[in-house]
């Protein structure tokens, strides 16, 4: 690496702007929460002092005055503890910002000194930071194994706050507890390297928890809590995350045939989206009618055991009169108790005449992946974090500068009854040392553009064999000599082996190539 050609410190600061943007946003949130807390408690204390002032004017109210005074003192002490907690959060955030400023000041000093070794050490630490970021985002979070074994139904709510500054810092601090059986490897690696102040891993842990709950456990509780806490931001950005989350909650209730809760969810949370998502609501209502027909068309569907309570609720919605009573709190005008309609039979007849494929799509588990992507985009956008992993972005940039049109084309040796020969050709002759073609980087390189190479490297003596394959003549002769020496192939001194086609050719079969 040339120190002279290395990017400037300003370039690195712009590239890693989120390292300062995130704590700045958390500081703003913490300040707003402090202000709300002070305003709320100040109003309550003001009323208490007014009441105390009224009581002390009458000597007969001395006991009441003392009781109220003690209550005021307790309120002030509680306020002091809460404010102390907020101040500690602010100090931690300021400590992060200070550490990051010093980190890039160190880079500036290294560049000015021109010390190559120290520069490489700085880049090694930066690489460790990228690795920690990737592991924190994508690893299993603490206690996930326990949660995945829970018998709680998918729509259940987990009452916890996950994105306030104080709760995130508290959650991150709890990772130091040695009694915890599951620790995020990204956070562990970050602390081992002494870089924990350079990455807002508490923010990443929060999104990791919610994301894994969605994709692995199909649990909506943490996401719904986060949506409620950040409703103002989601409304400001016109995000449809709340609708999709509530829609999925409705679908989960319908799946387990808890129609009463499904209808309540529809009335409480989905009706307000009537004007923005009318077609989706129409489809949601249709799912309630065709759910049994959809299940009968899904061969892999395993029915969920219903609780006694759900079975009891089911019996309440068996007729037209029952639906009218539930929705409109009255019976239809044409209702006659002596003439009940068999709704199940009519539903089967209706399902036969309706394309239920669009309703079956609502039961697809891929909806959880879609919901997870929508959440990640909203979450990362709120904090100004890159949606894509920074480590993969850097790798993609490096790989695309090496990728040529010859990459990712697998070369297989011919199948030979001589296993020793096949092994030698595969491991020694046709082995591709190109990093772009390696199993680790090939998936990343698939969709990347080719590099604009301005130089070409040609064989010194290119020849084409009758098979159409082109090789370096001297390397073919050296390979033939090695094969004869190892007694892997029986051939004459004037013959060579095509390692791809597996045919033996004489030297006189060479066709000299002239690149133009």
Swiss-Prot record:
Residues 203-261 form the CTLH domain. The keyword Iron does not apply. Coiled coil: none annotated. Its main location: cytoplasm. Residues 163-174 have a biased composition (Low complexity). GO terms for molecular function: ubiquitin protein ligase activity; zinc ion binding. A zinc finger (RING-Gid-type) spans 434-501. InterPro entries: CTLH/CRA, CTLH_C, Fyv10_fam, ZF_RING_GID. GO terms for cellular component: cytoplasm; GID complex; nucleus. Belongs to the FYV10 family. Involved in the proteasome-dependent degradation of fructose-1,6-bisphosphatase. This is Protein FYV10. It comes from Eremothecium gossypii (strain ATCC 10895 / CBS 109.51 / FGSC 9923 / NRRL Y-1056) (Yeast).
């Amino acid at each position: 690496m040339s120190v002279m050609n290395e990017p400037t410190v300003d370039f690195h600061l712009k590239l890693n702007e989120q390292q300062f943007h995130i704590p700045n946003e958390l500081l703003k949130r913490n300040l707003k929460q402090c202000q709300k807390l002070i305003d709320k408690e100040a109003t309550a204390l003001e009323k208490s002092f007014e009441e105390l002032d009224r009581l002390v004017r009458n000597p007969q109210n001395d006991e009441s005055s003392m009781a109220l005074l003690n209550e005021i003192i307790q309120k002030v002490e509680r306020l002091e503890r809460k404010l102390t907690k907020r101040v500690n959060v602010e100090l931690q955030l300021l400590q992060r910002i200070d550490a990051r400023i010093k980190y890039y000041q160190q880079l500036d000093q290294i560049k000015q000194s021109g010390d190559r070794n120290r520069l490489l050490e700085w880049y090694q630490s930066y690489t460790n930071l990228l690795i920690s970021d990737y592991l924190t985002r994508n690893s299993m979070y603490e206690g996930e194994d326990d949660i995945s074994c829970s018998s709680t139904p998918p729509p259940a709510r987990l009452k916890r706050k996950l994105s306030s500054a104080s709760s995130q810092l508290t959650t991150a601090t709890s990772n130091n507890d040695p009694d915890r059986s599951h620790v995020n490897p990204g956070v562990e690696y970050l602390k081992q390297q002494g870089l924990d102040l350079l990455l807002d891993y508490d923010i990443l842990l929060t999104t990791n928890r919610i994301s894994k709950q969605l994709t692995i456990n199909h649990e909506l509780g943490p996401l719904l809590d986060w949506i409620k806490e950040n409703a103002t931001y989601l409304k400001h950005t016109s995000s449809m995350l709340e609708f999709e989350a509530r829609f999925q909650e409705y679908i989960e209730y319908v799946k387990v045939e808890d129609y009463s809760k499904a209808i309540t969810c529809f009335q409480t949370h989905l009706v307000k989206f009537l004007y923005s998502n009318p077609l989706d609501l129409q489809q949601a209502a249709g799912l309630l009618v065709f759910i049994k027909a959809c299940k009968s068309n899904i061969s892999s569907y395993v029915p969920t055991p219903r609780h006694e309570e759900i079975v009891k609720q089911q019996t309440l919605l068996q007729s037209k009169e029952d639906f009218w009573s539930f929705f409109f709190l009255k019976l239809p005008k044409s209702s006659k108790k002596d003439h009940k309609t068999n709704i199940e039979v009519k539903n089967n007849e209706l399902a036969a005449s309706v394309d239920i494929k669009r309703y079956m799509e609502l039961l697809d588990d891929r909806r959880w992946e879609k919901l997870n992507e929508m959440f990640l985009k909203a979450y990362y956008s709120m904090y100004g974090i890159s949606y894509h992993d920074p480590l993969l972005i850097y790798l993609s940039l490096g790989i695309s500068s090496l990728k040529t049109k010859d990459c990712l084309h697998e070369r297989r040796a011919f199948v030979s009854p001589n296993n020793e020969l096949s092994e030698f050709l595969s491991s020694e002759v046709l082995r591709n040392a190109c990093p772009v073609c390696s199993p680790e980087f090939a998936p990343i390189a698939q969709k990347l553009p080719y590099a604009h190479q301005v130089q070409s490297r040609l064989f010194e003596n290119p020849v084409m064999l009758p098979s159409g394959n082109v090789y370096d003549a001297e390397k073919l002769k050296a390979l033939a000599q090695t094969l004869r020496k190892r007694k892997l192939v029986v051939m004459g001194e004037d013959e060579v082996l095509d390692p791809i086609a597996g045919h033996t050719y004489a030297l006189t079969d060479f066709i000299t190539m002239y690149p133009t």
